[in-house]
């Protein structure tokens, strides 16, 4: 009976250790809704990013407005307004490229699209999700070029 009590004590100690090891909080995830929102927010906050520029330049609606503009200032204003109208979406498939050993950082990739009027541009976007020691998550997006 003494042996059974010792085993029970050891098993309950292991159970407590397992439960406590999960208290560190969730690992960073590539495909969480917060991560997706953060990636789109980072990219959309830059009105002059190459993706929205490309979509604006390839929009027939924008091109029609540009052809009716007579001055460079008008053309510049049309392009600026078009870029500000850009809408963004992160594709359904997000890939986890790597995880750090301490499970505080993941690198990820996904397809980002920017739409301006009748034109949509797609580009792979790479980003990193990090969990700080205080448990807060941060997302950084690798700049991309066309």
Question: How should these model regions be labeled?
Answer:
Residues 23-146:
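Cystatin/cathelin-like cysteine-protease inhibitor module
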